[in-house]
Amino acid sequence: MKYQNILEEELKNKVGHDYFAAYNHTDIIERIDFAVAHPETFFGQKHYFLWAEAKRANFDIYKALAQLVLTIGKARTFERLLPPNYLGVFNSQLIAFIPYWEVQDIFTQNDFNWSVTPSDHNTAEFEQVYNRVKNILERNAYHFRFGTDDKELHTFIKENFVIGKTSTNKIYK
């Protein structure tokens, strides 16, 4: 395992350095763990490619992604910043991406209780988001194992973290 026995902060630093060195990966956006933006601003705005949840060890990526969606929805981050192309999650073993548009409609639900704590995995809201992101990740995720799929991960980032790109180039392993 490439990132064995390290703390979450160190994991974020190493993933940023190893895979996103060509981008700005040092921004801290409210409670979002990890963000990747184009290194230059455009008309004073940053263009984000990724907002991600980072978890150490072998944390459940479905729970982590559900937590990220709840974090973004609770803070209404998408109202202050242009949303990224992708939402993602990584732990010490792998990284996974989903297109932001796949979950965008969750944020506009009228009857959704956004006051829940994103890390409380026992709420009806968490369960709803968890089931949704699990379904998306199982059928339409782009996931890569650190160490094993490094070449494919670098290719995915190079081909898809491009300003103005509206579709995803799938990378076959």
Set out the residue ranges of the language-model regions.
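Acidic-basic catalytic patches of nuclease active cores, encompassing PD-(D/E)XK
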Residues: 1-29
